[in-house]
Curated annotation (Swiss-Prot):
PANTHER family noted in UniProt: LARGE RIBOSOMAL SUBUNIT PROTEIN BL27M (PTHR15893:SF0), RIBOSOMAL PROTEIN L27 (PTHR15893)
A single Gene Ontology CC term: cytosolic large ribosomal subunit
Keywords annotated in UniProt: Ribonucleoprotein, Ribosomal protein
Keyword Cell membrane: no
Pfam families for the chain: Ribosomal_L27
Matches recorded under Gene3D superfamilies: 2.40.50.100
Gene encoding the protein: rpmA
Lineage: Bacteria, Bacillati, Cyanobacteriota, Cyanophyceae, Nostocales
Cross-referenced HAMAP family: Ribosomal_bL27 (MF_00539)
Organism: Nostoc sp. (strain PCC 7120 / SAG 25.82 / UTEX 2576)
Protein name as it appears in the record: Large ribosomal subunit protein bL27
GO biological process: translation
PROSITE patterns the record matches: RIBOSOMAL_L27
GO molecular function, one term: structural constituent of ribosome
Entry similarity comment: Belongs to the bacterial ribosomal protein bL27 family.
Keyword presence, Ribosomal protein: yes
Amino acid sequence: MAHKKGTGSTRNGRDSNAQRLGVKRFGGQAVIAGNILVRQRGTKFHAGNNVGIGKDDTLFALVDGVVTFERKGKSRKKVSVYPAAAAEAVAS
């Protein structure tokens, strides 16, 4: 008679890949048109001036400029991109 136990099986051992969400370009950073600013699920950040929104809620720059994070009302946050010349006027 064999003296080895059967090894059995497990139902664990799986994990999904990370989605790599989050802010990709921060406030004050220079960006070019097409740069991804925020990868998100849902609209944690809303699109502001010169920012487009993809079908998966990704925010991206529509023009070359500088990124700014702003408040939109009490609880909403929005991301805008201002052209370099206009960004200096907004900052001051």
